[in-house]
């Protein structure tokens, strides 16, 4: 996948905000990998802040909606993984500031 396309996808994913934390999933460090096959099927590998997150279906739907606006994306599969586990260390500086974490 071209780097420019990957950047566009990550930019679209920055519009997906974790409803509990109010920060986007990219800056939270929840997106682990982005890939697209030759047919435009996009694979998003991501995690959530906790295994019991009741908002997982909402976040997955928001990811699909955000990517539907990109002409290269024909469909999206979201793969939720728990390994490696998410930690605050994965958050961007922006996310840490927004959440008051040092």
UniProtKB/Swiss-Prot annotation:
Coiled-coil annotated spans: none
Protein name, as recorded: Fe-S protein maturation auxiliary factor YitW
> What is the source species?
Bacillus subtilis (strain 168)
- State the SUPFAM superfamilies in the record: Fe-S cluster assembly (FSCA) domain-like
Alphabetical list of InterPro entries matching this protein: Fe-S_Maturation_MIP18, FSCA_dom_sf, MIP18-like
UniProt record similarity statement: Belongs to the MIP18 family.
Q: What does this protein do?
A: Involved in the maturation of iron-sulfur (Fe-S) proteins. May function as a Fe-S cluster carrier.
């Amino acid at each position: 996948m071209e780097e420019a396309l990957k950047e566009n996808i990550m930019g679209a994913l920055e519009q997906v905000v974790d409803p509990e934390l109010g920060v986007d999933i990219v800056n939270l460090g929840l997106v682990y990998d982005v890939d697209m096959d030759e047919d435009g099927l996009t694979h998003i590998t991501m995690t959530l802040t906790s295994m019991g997150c009741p908002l997982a279906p909402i976040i997955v739907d928001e990811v699909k909606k955000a990517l539907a606006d990109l002409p290269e994306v024909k469909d999206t599969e979201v793969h939720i993984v728990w390994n490696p586990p998410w930690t605050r260390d994965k958050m961007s500086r922006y996310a840490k500031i927004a959440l008051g974490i040092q």
